[in-house]
Amino acid sequence: MPSPLCIALVAGEASGDILGSGLMRALKVRHPDIRFIGVGGPLMEAEGMQSSFPMERLSVMGLVEVLGRLRELLARRKLLVQTLINEKPDVFIGIDAPDFTLNIELQLRRAGIKTVHYVSPSVWAWRQKRVLKIREGCDLMLTLLPFEARFYEEQGVPVRFVGHPLADTIPLESDRAGARAGLGLAQETPVVALMPGSRGGEVGRLGGLFFDTAERLLARCPELRFVLPCASPQRRAQVEQLLQGRDLPVTLLDGQSHVALAACDAVLIASGTATLEALLYKRPMVVAYRLAPLTFWILKRMVKSPYVSLPNLLAQRLLVPELLQDDATPEALARTLLPLIDDGREQTAGFDAIHRILRRDASNQAADAVLSLLGRSPSL
């Protein structure tokens, strides 16, 4: 009888904690005596992870913040690698956080430990040479999106497309009436969700632009109402300051982006992961983004993809309008969004097809792929 499995996982932020806990749960169903080590958040700890240190120590955003903590991050990684080599788990699974986990995978694979990376970094879009490090350090890549899997197949990296957990949790048809009732919005009133991003810099660059656009929409459609989910108390305070002196009928929500998307007819949205949520809720959208001019100039030369938004990358065509940098003016955004409030059927038909492709029971698919790599029976 084979010995109980020992699986090491490292997640670096809240989204990875969600993915990791779902994978752990699916693995335990198949092998109840499994043991988990590594680094995880509260959800992974609830599934039985013995975390070597708090996951929050890895949750660092921004170049300046990373540089300020670089010595600590490198020391933690070095100690973690040594601990895992001594423990000799059956497999190591790095969940997202590529700048931290890819190096661990490379060192562990050289030490004879099988490695899996769950959630592809955006190597298909920029810094494509990272795929060389992935090919050397990774026995298996698990991707959430199908076009990522095609890229790795072309690059000779073993890969499995497992689907996206959000596509599993968001229903194919959302309850618009229930969401509106919960927000106190009339069923017949047209509603636009404003989603200028979750980070302070994004809201600073896009918040005023989105409110200028809302004023132009309101001038053409006086019965229009707006909802804006705020990612944190800090973002809410920032948004409230940007709204001062404006007379806009906007309902601010604390979090609850899913409620805002379920309730609305169309979305004005910053490019980012929230566009996938909007797609899964089948809400017509216009994508906008602005960066510092130098940053935009550099990225424009580095990025290999013709599109920036996930809906277009998934559709492999221009399914949703993208207005970037100087093209993102209030007049252009309002003109593009207005017809979608009443009729976004072309977009939503494409969204429905993509949702069905992504809806693959991701956690169970990932668990089966990991167990197949180990030569263990994945069947229940």
UniProtKB/Swiss-Prot annotation:
Task: Tell me which EC number(s) this protein carries.
Answer: 2.4.1.182
Say yes or no: keyword DNA damage present: no
A Gene Ontology biological process term: lipid A biosynthetic process
Biological pathway: Bacterial outer membrane biogenesis; LPS lipid A biosynthesis
| GO MF annotation, one | lipid-A-disaccharide synthase activity
Q: Which GO terms describe its cellular component?
A: membrane
Q: What's the top EC group for this one?
A: transferase
The organism's superkingdom is given as: Bacteria
One Pfam annotation reads: LpxB
State the reactions this protein catalyses: a lipid X + a UDP-2-N,3-O-bis[(3R)-3-hydroxyacyl]-alpha-D-glucosamine = a lipid A disaccharide + UDP + H(+)
Which keywords label this protein? Glycosyltransferase, Lipid A biosynthesis, Lipid biosynthesis, Lipid metabolism, Transferase
* Keyword check for Nucleus: no
Question: What SUPFAM superfamilies does the record point to?
Answer: UDP-Glycosyltransferase/glycogen phosphorylase
The entry assigns this protein to a family as follows:
Belongs to the LpxB family.
Q: What does this protein do?
A: Condensation of UDP-2,3-diacylglucosamine and 2,3-diacylglucosamine-1-phosphate to form lipid A disaccharide, a precursor of lipid A, a phosphorylated glycolipid that anchors the lipopolysaccharide to the outer membrane of the cell.
Official protein name in the record: Lipid-A-disaccharide synthase
Organism the protein comes from: Pseudomonas syringae pv. syringae (strain B728a)
